[in-house]
Amino acid sequence: MDLAPKQTPREFAGKRGGKPSYKQVDISLRIVQLARKGKRVLRLKGGDPFVFGRGGEEAAALVSAGIPFRIIPGITSGIGGLAYAGIPLTHRDTNQSVTLVTGHDATGNVSQIDWKAISDGSPVIVIYMAMKHIERIVQELRDAGRPTNEPMAFVCNASMPNQTVMETTLGTCLEDIKKNQIKPPSIVVVGEVVNLRQGLDWLGAENGKLLINNIHPQIMEKQTG
């Protein structure tokens, strides 16, 4: 935004869970309207426009209107947000797969997905936009057989100066959410990769946190032995 000339018009069209936001159809129509006036329009999104970002809907509207466009990929919060929290999305000692899901569908209701299949098939689950239905999601995961002591983390305002990370478990997270007043925007991760944060929280280390290498103790033994 700072690179754009000062006289460039800026229109806010962001979305925040649980707060008044522009309707998606109005955003798409506004982009088309401006483009038809001969304007060069930049639709700036957080994360990646094609990962739960509704970029596909807006691009489809442009196609229908016969307006050419380009897509510049970004770093989705399920990857970048966890990296800023010191939590790797994958690690060969913990998981060979990961599942990204959204906490609600197009109607705003909890996602009608097969939680049992996801729980059985994915060691790590990353949930976008989960806070509105977090109680239901936690219950779905527990009913699907995920253990109550499974590590879980909430990354709030990821990569921002006011970023906070709450480590918890599937069994205690609802109490911890209330205690710590966790609110959106938050990215939620469930799985053993959360435990790796004590050795990989690079941002915390910059502020004096002592990191503990518990990832490859056998490698450390070979190096020092």
Tell me what each language-model feature is.
Residues M1, L62, G81-L82, I137, ...:
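Hydrophobic packing residues within well-ordered alpha-helices of enzyme cores
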Residues M1-I75, L174:
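Class I S-adenosyl-L-methionine
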Residues M1-L3, K19-D26, G80-L82, N109-V110, ...:
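Short, charged, surface-exposed secondary-structure boundary motifs
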Residues A4, A85-G86, L141, G145:
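Active-site catalytic pocket residues across diverse enzymes, especially alpha/beta-hydrolases
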Residues A13-K15, T102-G103, N157:
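Active-site donor-binding loop signature of nucleotide-sugar glycosyltransferases
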Residues D26, K37-V41, R54, N95-S97, ...:
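A contiguous loop/helix-start segment that scaffolds small-molecule binding in enzyme catalytic cores
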Residues G46-G121, T164-E167:
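Class I SAM-dependent methyltransferase SAM-binding "motif I" and its flanking Rossmann-like core
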